[in-house]
């Protein structure tokens, strides 16, 4: 579960906050071989860290019901933004184009996480929301687009099978899914500032 809830459940309940948000991960869905998932998709976490997130989500939702408090769960995809993006990898000389056919990743700009949370605070409820952009995309495409914007040659493609990866990095490629963000748009009226990686990288280029 969540150590904050474990330690301070009574204090939180006693304070009767008007809104509670817990930031989780789309990793709770596990692998779906590239198929679309939404908030109603049964959870099937693969990694230990995602199993722990499921336990934390369940604890917060139970806490919400027991105490009649609004708790919103936000399942975030891969976070990027200033200081954490494809350009940084080029700057550090670590940019690689790993290719695993059919593999996509889901992403979210940090500014859109903040925007979604702000929209949610205005509409307290006990609800789960995916916070991810409109376009799950192959990681090698993101690297190639960043290279194009920088005016440099893209790194050569490296087959996933032969790539030198840490166990954690390799584990991310064991999960392949496309995560829907329709609920956060429909129910919170949220409009993404960076609906895909192209829009975001063009904006981030100005900060490089």
Show the residue positions of the predicted features.
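NAD(P)-cofactor binding segment of oxidoreductase domains
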Residues: 1-23
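Active-site "gating" loop of Rossmann-like NAD(P)-dependent oxidoreductase/epimerase domains
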Residues: 26-50, 65
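Conserved beta-loop-beta element that borders a ligand/cofactor-binding pocket
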Residues: 58-82
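Substrate-positioning beta->alpha
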Residues: 79-89, 98-121, 127
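Mid/C-terminal beta-alpha module of Rossmann-like enzyme folds, strongest
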Residues: 114-117, 122-169
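Conserved C-terminal active-site "lid" loop/helix of NAD(P)H-dependent oxidoreductases
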Residues: 144, 163-191
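Amphipathic terminal alpha-helices
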Residues: 195-208
């Amino acid at each position: 579960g969540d150590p904050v809830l474990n330690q301070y459940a009574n204090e939180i309940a006693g304070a009767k906050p008007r809104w509670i948000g817990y930031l989780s991960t789309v990793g709770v869905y596990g692998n779906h071989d590239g198929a679309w998932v939404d908030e109603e998709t049964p959870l099937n976490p693969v990694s230990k860290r995602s199993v722990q997130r499921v336990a934390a989500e369940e604890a917060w939702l139970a806490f919400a019901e027991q105490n009649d408090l609004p708790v919103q769960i936000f399942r975030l995809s891969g976070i990027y933004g200033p200081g954490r993006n494809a350009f940084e990898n080029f700057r550090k000389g670590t940019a690689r184009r790993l290719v695993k056919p059919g593999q996509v990743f889901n992403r979210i700009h940090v500014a859109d996480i903040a925007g979604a949370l702000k929209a949610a605070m205005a509409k307290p409820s006990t609800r789960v929301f995916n916070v991810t952009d409109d376009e799950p995309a192959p990681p090698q495409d993101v690297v190639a687009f960043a290279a194009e914007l920088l005016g440099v040659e893209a790194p050569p493609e490296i087959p996933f099978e032969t790539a030198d990866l840490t166990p954690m990095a390799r584990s991310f490629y064991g999960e392949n899914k496309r995560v829907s963000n329709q609920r956060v748009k429909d129910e919170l009226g949220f409009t993404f500032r960076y609906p895909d990686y192209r829009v975001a990288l063009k904006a981030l280029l100005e900060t490089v």
